[in-house]
UniProtKB/Swiss-Prot annotation:
Its cofactor is Mg(2+); Mn(2+). Transmembrane segments: none annotated. Mg(2+) 2 binds at E38, H153. It is an enzyme of class 4 (lyase). This is 3,4-dihydroxy-2-butanone 4-phosphate synthase. One of its GO terms (molecular function) is 3,4-dihydroxy-2-butanone-4-phosphate synthase activity. Binds 2 divalent metal cations per subunit. Magnesium or manganese.
Length: 217
């Protein structure tokens, strides 16, 4: 990762702290993964504070494939099976079947309907029967251990929510350029500056978590 481009955002620890503060305030963060991996940036919001306006931004400014990151135990509680039996995607992204709230939605595709679906899925005591399958929201199952186990946006999202003291569920979508191509680090930094959204990396989250473990040790 070209850390020099990220220098204006502070050190790795400072970038994570800025991201956690934004999430606690109900705002979003931009997280970029490794250059030798997807080399993409995702706009991420906490599921519990997600608004219709934020969902509209995910649909308008990003790829439109809005995903709900959930920990393994939540996926099991909602009885969400994998989207496919044999996952052959390059990075093993753990999509489950897509979902829709059974109550409170129309077609399910509008920003408001997708927020309703997400709130239904993350509700305390949510049951499998609360959700229809398929739908317009795409859950992703995070691996236990977070970014120390798998350096993906899914795990990074759950780690950030837990570090921020929020419910372990987050919503993400890949940032795209106006021409439909994937945004890379320079474009993501510009996007963050335009919308006043902090930028950090998966590597930053790894370093932050390792520093916490070192302090505990």
């Amino acid at each position: 990762m070209n850390q020099s481009l990220l220098a204006p955002f502070g050190t790795a620890i400072e970038r994570v702290e800025a991201g956690l503060n934004a999430l606690r305030q109900g705002q979003g963060v931009l997280v970029v993964d490794d250059e030798d991996r997807e080399n993409e940036g995702d706009l991420i919001f906490a599921a519990q504070t997600l608004t219709n306006t934020q969902m509209a931004m995910l649909i308008r400014e990003c790829s439109g494939i809005v995903c709900l990151c959930l920990p393994d135990e939540k996926v099991k509680a909602l009885e969400l099976p994998p989207m496919v039996e044999n996952n052959s995607s390059q990075y093993g992204t753990a999509f489950t079947v897509s979902i829709e709230a059974k109550v409170g939605v129309t077609t399910g595709v509008s920003a408001a309907d997708r927020v309703t679906t997400i709130k239904a899925a993350i509700a305390d005591g949510a049951k499998p029967s609360d959700l229809a399958r398929p739908g317009h929201v795409y859950p992703l199952r995070a691996q236990p251990g977070g970014v120390l186990t798998r350096r993906g946006h899914t795990e990074g999202t759950i780690d950030l929510m837990q570090l921020a003291g929020l419910k372990p569920a987050g919503v993400l979508c890949e940032v795209t350029n106006p021409d439909g191509t994937m945004a890379r680090l320079p474009e993501i930094i510009a996007f963050g500056a335009q919308h006043n959204i902090p930028v950090l990396t998966i590597e930053d989250i790894v370093l932050y978590r390792k520093s916490l473990l070192a302090n505990v040790g």
